[in-house]
Amino acid sequence: VMFEDRVDDFTARQQVYNLLNDADLPDGVTPEVQPLYGPTGEIFRYTLRSDKRSVRELKTIQDWVIERNLRSVSGVADIVSFGGEVKTFEVSVNPHQLINYGITSLELYDAIAKSNINVGGDVITKSSQAYVVRGIGLINDLDELRNIVVKNINGTPILVKNLADVHESCLPRLGQVGRMDENDVVQGIVVMRKGENPGEVIANLKDKIEELNQNVLPEDVRIIPFYDREDLVNLAVKTVTHNLIEGILL
């Protein structure tokens, strides 16, 4: 969707949101509006390196740890990831076990879906302080998934592992990223929000990456930057300054 230059960015986005909310879309389809950035918003690129971990593990770290931390940097609009394998937990249902226990596949699906959400509660007030109640329910590993209760039959809990085989897998790969002598890497691209100062954003990014490398990531995992727009920005500023001085002198 292209708007004229004089249209305010936030007004334009709100109009798009309103039209999307009124659109008649199939069940399960949730439209998204991209973050606010321009065609020259790409300012930083990096890869992940580890001598011990697979690209699937690195992709998981990228999606769940690095992306969330880099998005918190002021001026960053989005983090775009390429390469690696997206880890999934796969449930292979045994139809004979479903029949034996009298459980439908929909009941199994609902039990897993309801056990994989975070829920907000109320607030408990004690003395002069208020404590927020929150239920953490996201599944972290295979054992948690295997031990989800699907149904109680005569006081006996029927678990997912009684009905299906649960194992780790990945989504179908749509491509692969290579760099230098590595033919399969995980790459991240940082996109700057429209109107921000690229020099300040890049400096803050470098500070955050140093913090992640030293204090947050596993010892064998490192973020390796290989491109940033700082040199281009400095050269452009130097050129403009030089031309202005020449123009004044002439």
Please describe what each predicted stretch is:
Residues 1-248:
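Membrane-proximal extracytoplasmic
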